[in-house]
């Protein structure tokens, strides 16, 4: 580690970074004005920039920046994930507990009547239930876009999450009321059920588009640096790896929460739907309490207000220059009419916007992927109902997707990915997403083969009726389809979320994340379009068609975007350029905020020592 001795001063904030990299806050007079500790403010700022250019300041210690050779040869490791991020992850876990606990029983609730062999409520049939299920999925992934706009421009992420959580709770309460047996028997559940779907969709959309960006915002915003381990070996602490691990943990928590299906499906079959929906309602109280008491602990990106106006101005100016975004940079075009561009945005903002647009292009193929993923929530549940389930509910088997993810996410994060990084084997986002498409294809191929086997068995063969609902084939051989989908999520879904966040400008992270989630809505539309084929005996061909389409989409995705992997490191550096472009006040605030209030006594001691050194030097 290098040693430094710096003074940083400004009229409204002064800090001293001493040889051990601790800092001192500004002195204030009785009238509240600041005391200036040096006469040469500009010199101090220059010295700060010089020291930061040769190293990275982390918790008061200065670590060297990696050289080109070190970037190419040293293994990359994860940095520290702050506890604040884990609190937000707990909120997401509870929200997903509620969401999956509610939605997995939906298929039976919608498809069957209360007197059927598999009890339900609305008696819509498989095709009708699939249509309403796909509408709900579509709605849940449309609402994040509106919520993201509200968060980025008006309320901020945290406030949007709080409002959405309250709306969500109201929706679950209405849903629970529709499942009361007397309401079902009276045939009055349909209206309340549809209303609850709309309200729950609003709530989950507001949380979905903002909770992962809020979590990722709590991670340290520092460039890569070289750290020497206790055994003398060197590693690069890479924020990209830190972000990747945070999203792995985030997605892992989603699937821990989704195990609520084990409880709600059991309650559905033994106690009834009202108890299955009452459990998520009670659990959802936990995130409401957490959100109510934890606001002061988080880092908050304030709403940007005019960010979308600026983006519109950029696109308007680009359209006047043959859609060349380079021509919208202030360094290329100084004014438009009476507007000075440097007062509206800088060159770096244009580079960030170009990076975000590249990310959005990759989202275009995701609807095909979500069609594969969506089979797990409707048609695969119905497929399980055509098999021998014993005393196990057919909608319970979706839990094997979550179980597989809970097992294999830590294996990938702690064994496979570090091993690849250790030997400098590139496994960058586009390659991971392509692999996700291939696993989704494999899952649909397996489902198609299994459906053909079901049709070959009696007593129903392909002629299922109200009195003949299942063939003589064990449901347990359906598990590999869920496991293959789980692998596809590790590579396609997690990477997509991470890609959306890391490639978005700071003031647009919610909206870019929402646009990624919005691809789910298009997947739901495609699923609605093919829902007419989700009937016997066409299901084998439906799964086959989905598999072929997903395979072609995966190949085209790789062909179109594989060159993005070569640009990955360069694109990630834009985030740190933005940090380097912070004003001195922002830099000082970062240092000040990093100093724990618990160390106040040590701080006062260092302050007195530094003041004594200053007096000696003057």
From Swiss-Prot:
Biased composition (Polar residues): 34-50
Residues that bear Phosphoserine: 22, 25, 33, 44, 51, 53, 594
Cell location: Membrane
Membrane topology: Multi-pass membrane protein
Disulfide bond annotation, renumbered to this chain: none
GO cellular component: cell division site; fungal-type vacuole; plasma membrane; plasma membrane of cell tip; vacuolar membrane
Record InterPro entries: MFS_trans_sf, POT_fam, PTR2_symporter_CS
Alphabetized Pfam families for the sequence: PTR2 (PF00854)
Modified residues (Phosphotyrosine): 23
Keywords assigned: Membrane, Peptide transport, Phosphoprotein, Protein transport, Transmembrane, Transmembrane helix, Transport
Membrane spanning stretches: 131-151, 161-181, 187-207, 247-267, 273-293, 400-420, 430-450, 475-495, 510-530, 541-561
Top-level taxon in the UniProt lineage: Eukaryota
Broad class of the protein's primary localization: membrane
Region (Disordered): 26-50
GO molecular function: dipeptide transmembrane transporter activity; tripeptide transmembrane transporter activity
Record-listed Phosphothreonine modification sites: 35, 45, 54, 618
GO biological process, any: dipeptide import across plasma membrane
SUPFAM superfamilies listed in its UniProt record: MFS general substrate transporter
Function: Uptake of small peptides.
Family under the similarity heading: Belongs to the major facilitator superfamily. Proton-dependent oligopeptide transporter (POT/PTR) (TC 2.A.17) family.
Protein name: Probable peptide transporter ptr2
Organism for this UniProt entry: Schizosaccharomyces pombe (strain 972 / ATCC 24843) (Fission yeast)
